[in-house]
């Protein structure tokens, strides 16, 4: 998840949000486990879970969930082989749609701070009862069960079995820093691409207008 700052900003305004997360994927699919899409109070959409029919169906599910509806765990089978199949990527994805409330603001502030410092942190979402997911954020590795730590070490998000409960584990993944020497048009395009895939971008240029964050 790289939406912690966006989520925190909206929660600070007292908003209720809908968050869609790919929690499991097998085979070929447009996005990986951990990809997310956020729907805000004014129905703005931040992030993507891959577009197409899947995203359209999930977006439709987000609207009632944001207003107070029951969380949903949606299953999409994209292994259709016929030419008229709507979804033929070849894979299968499970997507959790949950309501995010202002009471959860401390978790998201903490996660955003950890990400900015490249510090350890991991999201856990107990989805044993998909209608009532339990989301929490953890920063103390020594307090986590061995199966969770094993998943964290894989540097990827996934669902695991934890003492008979189904738990989604999403470690903070720090992509590193891209330093651009010069702020011209090539660096601008490179920086935008690097930011899009999760890197922190630093531009070094003695011309203030070229090193401006507004670019």
Residue ranges and their predicted role:
Residues 1-215:
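Segments forming oxygen-rich coordination pockets for charged ligands
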């Amino acid at each position: 998840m790289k939406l912690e700052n966006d989520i925190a900003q909206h929660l600070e305004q007292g908003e209720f949000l809908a968050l869609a997360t790919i929690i499991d994927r097998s085979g070929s699919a447009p996005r990986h486990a951990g990809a997310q899409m956020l729907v805000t109070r004014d129905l703005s959409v931040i992030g993507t879970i891959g577009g197409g029919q899947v995203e359209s169906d999930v977006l439709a599910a987000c609207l009632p969930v944001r207003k107070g509806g029951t969380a949903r765990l949606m299953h999409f089978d994209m292994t259709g082989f016929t030419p008229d199949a709507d979804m033929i990527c070849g894979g299968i994805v499970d997507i959790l749609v949950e309501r995010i409330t202002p009471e959860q603001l401390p978790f998201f502030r903490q996660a955003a701070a950890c990400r900015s410092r490249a510090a350890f942190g991991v999201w856990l979402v107990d989805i044993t009862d998909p209608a009532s997911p339990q989301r929490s954020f953890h920063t103390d590795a020594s307090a986590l069960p061995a199966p969770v730590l094993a998943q964290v070490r894989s540097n990827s998000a996934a669902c695991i079995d934890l003492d008979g409960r189904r738990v989604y584990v999403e470690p903070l993944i720090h992509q590193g820093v891209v330093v651009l020497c010069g702020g011209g048009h090539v660096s601008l395009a490179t920086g935008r691409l690097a930011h899009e895939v999760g890197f922190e971008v630093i531009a070094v240029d003695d011309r203030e207008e070229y090193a401006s964050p507004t670019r």
